[in-house]
Curated annotation (Swiss-Prot):
InterPro entries in UniProt: LarE, NAD/GMP_synthase, Ni-pincer_cofactor_biosynth, Rossmann-like_a/b/a_fold
GO function term, MF aspect, one: sulfurtransferase activity
Organism expressing this protein natively: Synechocystis sp. (strain ATCC 27184 / PCC 6803 / Kazusa)
Cited PANTHER family: EXSB FAMILY PROTEIN, NAD_GMP SYNTHASE DOMAIN-CONTAINING PROTEIN
Top-level taxon of origin: Bacteria
Homology family: Belongs to the LarE family.
The protein, known as: Uncharacterized protein slr1717
Classification via NCBIfam families: ATP-dependent sacrificial sulfur transferase LarE
Length: 268
């Protein structure tokens, strides 16, 4: 099954002369970039959008991973923070983010002779609330993992099969996803959340989210790590550090980390 899906992915790129990959450095777009490069070689390029919602560490990872693959890698600046429809953080915020991404990449792709902007949306994403997918479709974007019904688990399994060292890399959506819908997003808030998550990663907690609700930080960890976290971490030092970052209050979510938790309000 995995081999057949990998072969389907190779065939997808085999039908193209060139491929431009919207490359975040996550496990999904990294698999897409790897297979595109294996099939097309120098006719494949990965482009990463740089904005305040991208952690500097994630950019460094993307650069290192692209170098490991061998694919040409370029950076572009996106300016979604200048769009009040985005910074107001409505329920369809991701639509405006992906619109900015594709409106930036599509003219570049056409100028360089690429017919499509190709992303790492996977089959599971189609079953979640992802308004950004619609923005990509409206602009002619292609999502081979979704088109071939390759799930997140299969992405990881195929990545492991191909020997990609980061096949089990934790998901790392943009920092704007840390805020409840309706709370305005600012560069300062993004930086505050970013610093807090980097601090926790350096303590050894890689699968972590710092949800920001006004002046309150809510830490989410995998449920099985919560008890150990409370035992091992100096809570007083943690609170002081977070307050230095700009938070007034620091809490630990006892339910633990769950992807898309802030989307619960959409079903009520």
């Amino acid at each position: 099954m995995l081999e057949s899906k990998l072969e389907n992915l190779r065939q997808f790129f085999g039908e193209l002369d060139r491929a431009l990959i919207a490359y975040s450095g996550g496990v999904d777009s990294t698999l897409v970039a790897k297979v595109a490069y294996d099939v097309l070689g120098q006719n494949a390029v990965a482009i990463t959008a740089v904005s305040p919602s991208l952690l500097p560490e994630e950019l460094e990872d993307a650069q290192a991973q692209a170098q490991w693959i061998g694919i040409a890698h370029e950076l572009v600046q996106t300016n979604e923070m200048a769009n009040p429809n985005y910074t107001a953080n409505p329920e369809n915020r991701c639509y405006f983010c992906k619109s900015e991404l594709h409106d930036t990449l599509q003219p570049l792709a056409l100028a360089l002779g690429y017919n499509y902007v190709i992303d790492g949306v996977n089959g599971d994403d189609l079953r979640d609330y992802r308004p950004g997918i619609q923005a990509a479709k409206e602009r002619g974007g292609r999502s081979p993992l979704a088109e071939l019904q390759i799930s997140k688990l299969e992405v990881r399994q195929i990545s492991q099969l191909l020997g990609l060292p980061w096949w089990d890399k934790p998901a790392q959506p943009c920092l704007s996803s840390r805020f409840p819908y309706g709370e305005e997003i600012t560069v300062e808030k993004l930086q505050r959340v970013g610093r807090a998550e980097i601090y926790l990663r350096r303590l050894g907690y890689n699968q972590v989210r710092v949800r920001s609700e006004q002046n309150l930080a809510r830490i989410e960890l995998p449920p099985e790590q919560i008890q150990q976290f409370v035992q091992d971490v100096s809570l007083g030092e943690l609170v002081q550090t977070f307050q230095n970052f700009g938070f007034l209050y620091v809490t630990l979510d006892l339910e633990g980390y769950q992807s898309g938790k802030l989307n619960r309000v959409l079903t009520k």
